[in-house]
Amino acid sequence: MQFSKMHGLGNDFMVVDAVTQNVYFSPELIRRLADRHTGVGFDQMLVVEPPYDPELDFHYRIFNADGSEVSQCGNGARCFARFVRLKGLTNKRDISVSTQTGRMILSVTEDELVCVNMGEPNFEPQSVPFRAAKAEKTYILRAAEHTVLCGVVSMGNPHCVMQVDDVSVANVALLGPVLESHERFPERANIGFMQVVSREHIRLRVYERGAGETQACGSGACAAVAVGIQQELLGEEVHVELPGGSLHISWKGPGHPLYMTGPATHVYDGFIHL
């Protein structure tokens, strides 16, 4: 099977063309391939499939390193767009894809950055999903003997975002896994630790559902900005600084889609016998 290794700001992927190849991945096989000592090694596997809807260009599937399938990965979406162009599957600059939960437009710029229309952030608890009687701007969660004030949003996948004074010393290793599997998130969640530098600049670390802390999380950056704007902490255009690099997030507020712009890097092509 042919594949490519790619990354978006250090969030790394094994990308597989299932348009021209017949492939099947069990959770066990994905876990073996994800192993950084004995496999290919990656945070997520991205699979390019033929479109389920003839009006679209491709279907986009995402698998975490633990073998679970998820509905959204923003950094992966940028790599997906670069991959289908590099492999000659399309020459379009505006690429339409479906996911488990919706549709996206991926736009490749002249300087090969990728702008992703991530859709409108959804704060309704049942859509996240999150167990709450009604939608609030902030919720109180208790985890590992800590009381956490957070915002909750779906970007096509569930996110919990908390504000911290200094992201460099945030207790991601302790709070990340506890909040990821908190009982109020029936499908688990991605956990963002956000330091607000100014209304146009945040620093962010993300503990990803099924992958642990990564160098960057695109949907996590989108979620953090959406929550920050909802809580009136941020403006419409925000520079998001992650351990692996920076993204630009733009959102005009309710009724409008959120846009994420950033790089996608091709590392190498490979072949593996399954």
UniProtKB/Swiss-Prot annotation:
<dbReference type="InterPro" id="IPR018510">
    <property type="entry name" value="DAP_epimerase_AS"/>
</dbReference>
<dbReference type="GO" id="GO:0008837">
    <property type="term" value="F:diaminopimelate epimerase activity"/>
</dbReference>
<feature type="active site" description="Proton acceptor">
    <location>
        <position position="217"/>
    </location>
</feature>
<feature type="binding site">
    <location>
        <position position="11"/>
    </location>
    <ligand>
        <name>substrate</name>
    </ligand>
</feature>
<feature type="binding site">
    <location>
        <begin position="218"/>
        <end position="219"/>
    </location>
    <ligand>
        <name>substrate</name>
    </ligand>
</feature>
<keyword id="KW-0413">Isomerase</keyword>
<keyword id="KW-0963">Cytoplasm</keyword>
<feature type="binding site">
    <location>
        <position position="64"/>
    </location>
    <ligand>
        <name>substrate</name>
    </ligand>
</feature>
<keyword id="KW-0457">Lysine biosynthesis</keyword>
<feature type="binding site">
    <location>
        <position position="190"/>
    </location>
    <ligand>
        <name>substrate</name>
    </ligand>
</feature>
<feature type="binding site">
    <location>
        <begin position="74"/>
        <end position="75"/>
    </location>
    <ligand>
        <name>substrate</name>
    </ligand>
</feature>
<dbReference type="Pfam" id="PF01678">
    <property type="entry name" value="DAP_epimerase"/>
</dbReference>
<comment type="pathway">
    <text>Amino-acid biosynthesis; L-lysine biosynthesis via DAP pathway; DL-2,6-diaminopimelate from LL-2,6-diaminopimelate: step 1/1.</text>
</comment>
<comment type="function">
    <text>Catalyzes the stereoinversion of LL-2,6-diaminopimelate (L,L-DAP) to meso-diaminopimelate (meso-DAP), a precursor of L-lysine and an essential component of the bacterial peptidoglycan.</text>
</comment>
<comment type="subunit">
    <text>Homodimer.</text>
</comment>
<dbReference type="GO" id="GO:0009089">
    <property type="term" value="P:lysine biosynthetic process via diaminopimelate"/>
</dbReference>
<protein>
    <recommendedName>
        <fullName>Diaminopimelate epimerase</fullName>
        <ecNumber>5.1.1.7</ecNumber>
    </recommendedName>
</protein>
<comment type="similarity">
    <text>Belongs to the diaminopimelate epimerase family.</text>
</comment>
<feature type="site" description="Important for dimerization">
    <location>
        <position position="268"/>
    </location>
</feature>
<feature type="site" description="Could be important to modulate the pK values of the two catalytic cysteine residues">
    <location>
        <position position="208"/>
    </location>
</feature>
<feature type="active site" description="Proton donor">
    <location>
        <position position="73"/>
    </location>
</feature>
<feature type="binding site">
    <location>
        <position position="44"/>
    </location>
    <ligand>
        <name>substrate</name>
    </ligand>
</feature>
<keyword id="KW-0028">Amino-acid biosynthesis</keyword>
<feature type="site" description="Could be important to modulate the pK values of the two catalytic cysteine residues">
    <location>
        <position position="159"/>
    </location>
</feature>
<dbReference type="GO" id="GO:0005829">
    <property type="term" value="C:cytosol"/>
</dbReference>
<dbReference type="InterPro" id="IPR001653">
    <property type="entry name" value="DAP_epimerase_DapF"/>
</dbReference>
<feature type="binding site">
    <location>
        <begin position="208"/>
        <end position="209"/>
    </location>
    <ligand>
        <name>substrate</name>
    </ligand>
</feature>
<feature type="binding site">
    <location>
        <position position="157"/>
    </location>
    <ligand>
        <name>substrate</name>
    </ligand>
</feature>
